[in-house]
C-alpha cells in the first residue's frame, strides 16, 4: 500500500466498542486543500453538519481528521454538536494545530450520545502512535464491516510522482447518493480548491453514488479528500491535462473502494454489476442502473439464482427514466457464460439450467441493452439474504 508524503495515521481501541479498534486519526504535516461530499439524507449527523461548516470556512487549511466508530452521533441534538466540536478541539490540542483545521466523523448506532471521556482518552492515545501505516486507521473506522477497505495508486504529473491512498468503511445502509459509508482520500498532489471540488464530485457520481447494499441512506456518509501538495507538482487547475490524470487516479481508488463495500455487504453472497448500455442519455442510464441494483426483488432473485428477468425490466420501468420498453434486450453473464433472457422487451426461450449455472457464480453481470442511444452507466450491488436480517436484527445488542 502506497502512502502519500506527509500523511500519518493511527487507530486505537478507546472502549466505545467491546473489543475492536474504534478511534482513528489522519494527520498531515502541512495544511491540505480539502473537499467533501456528504449524505443526501435530510437527517444529518452532527459531524456532517460540523464538517460542512468547516469546509466552507477553511477549505485550504485542513490538517487532520478524527473518526470514531460504534456511535454515530446522529439524532443527538445540541449535545451532539457540542461533542463533535469537542472531538475537534481535543484533536487540535493533542496535535498542536488550529481547531478549524480538524474534521470530524462518526459511524455506528444512531441516537446515542458519545462517551466523551473514552473518546478524549482515545484521541490522546492515537496522537501518540501516529505512523506511516494506514492499517490501524482502516481498522478503527469499521462497524459491521468484515474486512478493511484500502486502495492506493501512483501517477506522474509534471514529472512528479503523485500518490493517492483511499481508506473506506461500509457494509450496510448503502444506497446510491452516499450511504453509511465513510471514505477518506489522501494525496500529495498540489491542486486548487476549485479543481479538487470538481474532481471529487465527478468521481463520486460514478463510484459511491452507483452502489447499493440495502436501499437505506445513512445520516453520516461522507467522502473527504485531502491534498497536501508535497509532491511538488505545478498546482493543478480544472480541465487541464494534470487534472484528468489525477482524476483517473482518484477515480480508480474510489471505484475499487466502492466495489469493496458492495463485496462486503451485510450477509452478501454475490456481487452484481449492472451495465446499462446504448441509453438515450447519461441521466437515464444512471437512473436505470441504480434502480436495478436497488431492487429487493432483483437482489433476492440473484440470491436464489433465479433468472427472473421481469424483475429487472420492472425496476428499469420505475426508475424515473423515459425510454421505449419495446427495444430492451437483457442478458445475464458471469464466468460461467452469458445468456439472453429478453429481446425487444419480451421474454425469449432460454435454458433455465444454463441460466442457473450462470447465476451460481459469485459475481453476476446484468446487461441491459436499451438500443436507444450511445450512453452507458455501471452500478454495483449485492444479493439480499437471511444473514442480512440476522445482522441488522441484533445490531444494538
Swiss-Prot record:
Provide the binding site for substrate: 143, 169, 180, 266, 392, 397
Q: Magnesium: present as a keyword of the record?
A: no
- Which UniProt keywords are listed? Acyltransferase, Amino-acid biosynthesis, Arginine biosynthesis, Autocatalytic cleavage, Cytoplasm, Multifunctional enzyme, Transferase
Which top-level enzyme class is recorded in the Swiss-Prot or TrEMBL entry? transferase
Feature type site, description Involved in the stabilization of negative charge on the oxyanion by the formation of the oxyanion hole: 107-108
Residues annotated as site: Cleavage? 179-180
Q: What is its main location?
A: cytoplasm
Associated pathway = Amino-acid biosynthesis; L-arginine biosynthesis; L-ornithine and N-acetyl-L-glutamate from L-glutamate and N(2)-acetyl-L-ornithine (cyclic): step 1/1; Amino-acid biosynthesis; L-arginine biosynthesis; N(2)-acetyl-L-ornithine from L-glutamate: step 1/4
Q: GO:BP terms for this protein?
A: L-arginine biosynthetic process; ornithine biosynthetic process
Keyword Cell cycle listed: no
Which catalytic residues are annotated?
A: 180 (nucleophile)
Q: Might you give the EC number(s) for this enzyme?
A: 2.3.1.35, 2.3.1.1
Subcellular location, record wording? Cytoplasm
Q: Which InterPro entries match?
A: Arg_biosynth_ArgJ (IPR002813), ArgJ-like_dom_sf (IPR016117), ArgJ_beta_C (IPR042195)
Q: Matching SUPFAM superfamilies, A to Z?
A: DmpA/ArgJ-like
The reaction(s) annotated as catalysed by this protein in its Swiss-Prot or TrEMBL entry are:
N(2)-acetyl-L-ornithine + L-glutamate = N-acetyl-L-glutamate + L-ornithine; L-glutamate + acetyl-CoA = N-acetyl-L-glutamate + CoA + H(+)
A GO CC term assigned to this protein in UniProt = cytoplasm
Record's superkingdom? Bacteria
From the UniProt record, which GO molecular function terms apply? glutamate N-acetyltransferase activity; L-glutamate N-acetyltransferase activity
Q: Which family does it belong to?
A: Belongs to the ArgJ family.
Q: Which NCBIfam families match?
A: ArgJ (TIGR00120), PRK05388.1 (NF003802)
Q: Quaternary form? A: Heterotetramer of two alpha and two beta chains.
Q: According to its UniProt entry, what is the function of this protein?
A: Catalyzes two activities which are involved in the cyclic version of arginine biosynthesis: the synthesis of N-acetylglutamate from glutamate and acetyl-CoA as the acetyl donor, and of ornithine by transacetylation between N(2)-acetylornithine and glutamate.
Q: What protein name is recorded for this chain? A: Arginine biosynthesis bifunctional protein ArgJ
Q: Which organism is it from?
A: Thermotoga maritima (strain ATCC 43589 / DSM 3109 / JCM 10099 / NBRC 100826 / MSB8)
